[in-house]
């Protein structure tokens, strides 16, 4: 049964494959054992033809195939995904696209999302841990959801650590994810927007840099536009 499902998915992906996209991704350094280059809307359509299940999702995830990993995030039931398995998936994320899809399709829906966020944001060992935390926050805030006080406090402090601490060494993708989450948080209310912008007051040296000015002005424009 499982092998039949995997064969059917491979067939569906071959029929939808886009060689130009997969070649372009490979040229940009995104290298999988197999990449069909299938666009996300079509991957969603394929996912809709299969029953979600942990066994199928696990089998898809373990393969070094771009579309399999994305489908795994779509087909894994959130209520049957242990905490340790979530942490393991984060360790195994190969590229930003997979981090984004896991955060959007699965991680933000987990019943223990607050605990997962605290574990990820203080994890500096795994390449994508902090980035995934910000991506999850972005999804939650975009939907107008709130998080418990300790998680919110960690979010506010760690955003500025990622963005403004020169010695922290945050990656570009981590900074971008942090800014994205800050935008959705600030959109929720005027108080939230002020919280985000006031954080820059503690980093006057960063505010004198072109990067600091660009991020601050980007956030300010965002909050004024949505106010």
Regions found by a protein language model. Give the residues of each.
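Alpha-helical scaffold domains
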Residues: 1-227
